[in-house]
Amino acid sequence: MFKRTIPLFAAFTLAISPSVFPNYAHAQEDKPKTNQYWWPKMLDLSPLRQPNATSNPMGEKFNYAEEFNSLDLNAVIEDLKKLMTTSQDWWPADYGNYGPLFIRMSWHAAGTYRIYDGRGGANGGFQRFAPQNSWPDNANLDKARRLLWPIKQKYGRKISWADLLVLAGNVAMESMGFKTIGFAGGREDAWEAININWGPEGKWLESKRQDKDGKLEKPLAATVMGLIYVNPEGPNGVPDPLAAAEKIRETFGRMAMNDEETVALIAGGHAFGKTHGAASGKYLGPAPEAAGIEEQGFGWKNSYGSGKGKDTITSGLEGAWTVTPTHWSHNYLQNLFNFNWVKTKSPGGAIQWVPENSNASSMVPDAFDPSKRHAPVMLTTDLALKFDPVYSKIAKRFLDNPKEFDDAFARAWFKLIHRDMGPRSRYLGSLVPKEVMIWQDPVPPVDYKLVDANDIANLKGKILNSGLTTSELVKTAWASASTFRGTDMRGGANGARIRLAPQKDWPANDPQELAKVLKTLESIQNNFNNAQADGKKISLADLIVLGGNAAIEQAAKQAGYDIIVPFMPGRTDATQGMTDVKSFEVLEPKADGFRNYFDKSNNMSPPEMLVEKASLLKLSVPEMTVLVGGMRVLNANTGQNQYGVFTDKPGILNNDFFVNLLSMSTEWKKSSETEGIYEGYDRKTGKLKWKATSVDLIFGANSELRAVAEAYATDDAKDKFIQDFVNAWVKVMTADRFDIKAANANINS
């Protein structure tokens, strides 16, 4: 799964004939410059505008879940198995079997997942698009995807590319004798590339992403630009297994794998297939995105020999790890520990390792010539499993207990290819395993009767008469629901994990105030549930959201508007035992502009972190804008700070934030006392009127955000503001409710 990082791809050049496009280079130079080019510090709002729904050719009514559930999955699997051993002349299969190639494809599709922001992973099928389709580490996976095209063409919309890319690797393992624990569909296709921060480097295979302590900058997971994980020859090409182990532990940890899962994945994945380095990388042409149009999406055209088969160049490393490259075995671990390994170089010049014992030189069959034999190989990153004391202990245990190893690899593989899918409720198909795993963030099923409209009205009354303030109720509901990440579908209000470790202690959540609110809501919950004789219940997860809704309805009524905030019961309460504390720590908000909270450890500015938060919540620019304006007047800042509370009537839902922000009666200056704070003075009297953060003022300073702010500040926008705020609020409250579709509110003034 690891690919080399020597200057293999440095010789790539544009393969378009100048006689066909004589002014191509000139046209590139004359390409219009973006606003970001002219003003690099301008706040980038593009994350809130992707993906663009108009890019999807399937249309708004397309329901992928319905299509997938109508698919004959067994027929697809049989077609995949047949494909595995049907070698094509245009890209011959190693050992007559494409299985190892498909495993690598699946691994590299899913393995981009990272825990700190939930981005990456197989969902969307982004391996088809730039930059992933042209990463050095994904060399020749363009052929793997093209091999799958007849199957995708046959089954069409019933199976997405995203699902097919993963299913192919799973079936490959099964067809080669390994028993997986299942497969879940449900990954919808993306239709355009999206901008993701993959690192600061300006060149492929560079590594300039470490902080002063040598650790990867967050949220990155890979150690090198253009690689999935680490340099297989060792950090910076230095063949040091112990140093490689440190990098492996860091990067695999950032893709949600512990030490045992890491060893299982490497040892299991390298039980199959081989690496390819028949010659130097100088023979390779450009990656797909830079290749000539006549290549039709293919890249890395190889001018060495036949350019394929025995002459294939991918990573520059060359050889197989085991004597059974197309059959599941435990030979990888046997070889790792049974031999002493000596450093050598592949025909392509990459550093790798072979057994010291010359008797091992004919153990491994050749991929194409049955008369040839080879020695097994190991990479520096493989030897990390032997020499790192923690990895070695695990690997030896797996060697001595093959069944335990099989189970560990099956579980780690399933986690790898499903980690970015979110809760089990999103899983589709007949191959979904019945076992519930803690990394799936499970919640209990609804095994009771849900509350009806009369109950909801009664409960709202009790909440509003409990002594809890509008601010407290809104903040608690927001803190619970806004943990949701639309990248990997984690977090959200379902489960009421805000009452559990670690969320109950997060500084952004005002732990002392939160404990008071939860205690009051739990009392209301218990009194209601104990009074029911028909099995009806309200969960705390539902009650937290209902409390926020009730507070907003009251705040709108005080502004002169009657509105019902849509509420859909059905959330349940998770237990601490269902919650992996360490796993949830990465969801902690280090900044939340909606609550005017910012931890100075961030390496991005407060406005940038606001956009990041809104992006994770899948909000649009107007939704982000209206929510900030509403949260400010509802006095919902962390710590009850008054920054941006531009109203003399806090707790009442109105458009005062925008009206007062845009008023020319105020002159803004940087605070001379507090860094990052701004003070607004009355232009006539010089009296201090407001204090604000850069998150507040960005809605007046950024031209695009100001345009939206103006739309909510007009005299005729008061009802629209409330309507839009409630709709955006409901979107956040129901973001993790994959079982429903959010409803819009209706307003009466």
UniProtKB/Swiss-Prot annotation:
Heme b binds at residue 270. One of its GO terms (biological process) is cellular response to hydrogen peroxide. Residues 1-27 form the signal peptide. It comes from the Bacteria. Formation of the three residue Trp-Tyr-Met cross-link is important for the catalase, but not the peroxidase activity of the enzyme. There is a cross-link at residues 229-255 (Tryptophyl-tyrosyl-methioninium (Tyr-Met) (with W-107)). GO terms for molecular function: catalase activity; heme binding; metal ion binding. Keywords: Heme, Hydrogen peroxide, Iron, Metal-binding, Oxidoreductase, Peroxidase, Signal. Binds 1 heme b (iron(II)-protoporphyrin IX) group per dimer. The active site is at residue 108. SUPFAM superfamilies: Heme-dependent peroxidases. GO terms for cellular component: cytosol. Belongs to the peroxidase family. Peroxidase/catalase subfamily. This is Catalase-peroxidase 2.
